[in-house]
Amino acid sequence: MKILAVELSSARGSLAWRDGSDADFVRDWQNDRKNSGPFFEYLVEVQKKFGKPDTIIVGLGPGSYAGTRIAISAAIGLSMAGGTGSVPSDAKTESVGRHGGRPSIRLIGFPSICAIDCDAAEYCMIGDARRQTFFFARVRDNNLAEGPTLMSEAELREKMDKFDGKMSIFATEKLPQFERAEVRYPCAKVLAQLASDPKGNFALPPLEPIYLREPHITVPKR
C-alpha cells in the first residue's frame, strides 16, 4: 500500500511516503504557520517522484490549528483529485472537498501526539493550551489511553508527580514550568507506519483538528 503521511501540528513539520515495510521518502523542516512554502515544495516533490498514493494520513493534533487545517485541506485536495496535477490552493481545495466527486484515495486522520518520534511504548504528552491551562494525555502503543484533558498548572503538576521517574513525559515546545518534560515532535514517518495497520482506530472524513475546547464562533452583529 502506498501511503502519504502529513504532519503540521507542531514547530517541526514532516512528510513521509511509505510503500511496503519502510519509508521511502521522509522530509522534515522548521514549520512556520506564516510560511507553508516548504510543505508544498516537498508535497510536489513526493508527487513527482512517486505519483498517486493509496492512502493519505494526516496528523490531527492537538497542536497548531492553522498548521493542521493546512494539512487537512491539502490532503482533501489530493484525495479528490486522485493525486495528480499540481497541489491545489486553499480555495480550490475547499471547493473540491465540498462539491467534488467520490475520492479515489483513502483519507484518514490520527492524533499527532500518538505519533511521537520516540522508542517509548508508553508516555505522557503535555502542552500549553493557553488561558492559563495545559493539556495532559497518556499514550500507550501509539493509541490514546487517557485524555487529552485540560488542567491548571497545579493540577498537571499533581498529576505528573504521581508517575515514577521511568515514565517518559514529552511536549512539543519547551515548558519552563515542567522541567521533566522533554521536547519531542510528532513524526510523519510514524504516521505512515501506523496507517498500514488495517485495524487502526483512524478518524474518517470530514477530518477536523483535535480541539481542546469548543471552536470559537463569532456571530456577526445585526
Predicted regions and their residues:
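A generic structural signal for ordered secondary structure
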Residues: L15, K49-F50, A74-G77
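Short amphipathic alpha-helical segment that frequently serves as the phosphate-/nucleotide-binding helix
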Residues: F39-F40, I72
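DPxDG-like acidic metal-binding loop motif
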Residues: T55-G83, S104-I105
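Phosphate/pyrophosphate-binding loops at sites that engage ATP/ADP/AMP, CoA/4′-phosphopantetheine
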Residues: Y42-T55, K162-D164
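Bulky hydrophobic/aromatic packing residues
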Residues: G13, V46, T68-I70, G82, ...
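Oxyanion-binding and handling regions
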Residues: M1-D24, D32-P38, S86, A91-S95, ...
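Active-site phosphate/pyrophosphate- and oxyanion-stabilizing loops and adjacent acidic/basic residues
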Residues: V44, I76, C114
